[in-house]
Amino acid sequence: MNTKTLPLVIEPDVLDKSLGYENLLIVDLSRPETYLKMHVPGAVHLDYSQIIAVSRPAMGLVPEDATLTRVFSALGVDEHTHVVAYDDEGGGRAARLLWTLEVAGHKHYSLLNGGLHAWVNEGHPLETTAATPTAKTFQLRRNNAPLADSAYISDRLGRDDCRLLDARSPDEYNGLKKYAERAGHIPGAVNLEWTQAIDTGRNMRLKTDEELNALLSPLGITADKEVIVYCQTHHRSAHTYLMLRQLGFENVKGYAGSWSDWGNNPDLPVE
């Protein structure tokens, strides 16, 4: 196996055997103090704030192309690089990096299944010395296919061939917790909190395909539909995006800004 054949969701033992491969870049989005304490050998650290933009009240937006080009070049990404991302929180930050790479036109990436939890708990090697990225030239080719905004979603409300999946907590979905001017959810959206896809009994891995489909199918989330995922800032829902991609869903989009955008716009409908 080489980097061209690495799967979308990679197991720790497979990554362990792949350490040192040419064109492999491992990116750690854990907290800085965690990274300095322990990380996958050779992994470079990336602060999550580098891959999101803010235009208050909207948070979690996609940065300008020039910003992404600068960040990914400094990180050491070029057209040949296969990025494996992980974090220490269950995969949300890592998944957001991979979704952002997709938006930037980069196709070669994997999510470490279980992240740092699985890597450490299953006895794989660790390093404490910070790795210095080797800068490369990243050629951004903007790809809007994985991206939805409020106008795009508004045009699809009520359509049978499109489903909205809210990855926030049930309390946020039902309007009992409010982190924007308005509470509730986008009309027609169904709710599956992002953590429901995580198997805490298997070191924070994704649940099996069968288990995930059993959660999704009753909600009307099936692979023949377009699915748009969102949360508060497209952090949690980035994990949901990767989960759906792993299941073979081909038409999936993430709403950058998510409820911090929709919930603060008085012109948009709310349930």
What residues fall within each predicted segment?
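Cysteine-dependent PTP/DSP-like catalytic domain, specifically the C-terminal lobe
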Residues: 253-271
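Thiolate-centered catalytic microenvironments shared by cysteine-dependent enzyme domains
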Residues: 4, 56-156, 176-177, 184, ...
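Structural recognition of the beta-strand scaffold that forms the well-ordered cores
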Residues: 45-46, 82-85, 163-164, 228-229, ...
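C-terminal soluble interaction/assembly domains
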Residues: 228-229, 247, 267
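Short, isolated positions within intrinsically disordered regulatory regions of eukaryotic proteins
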Residues: 103, 123, 198, 263-266
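Positively charged, proline/Ser/Thr-rich regional signature most characteristic
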Residues: 2-79, 149, 154-224, 264, ...
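Small/polar glycine-rich anion-binding or flexible loop at a beta-alpha turn
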Residues: 228-236, 261
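Residue-level signal for short, function-critical loop segments
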Residues: 43, 89, 233
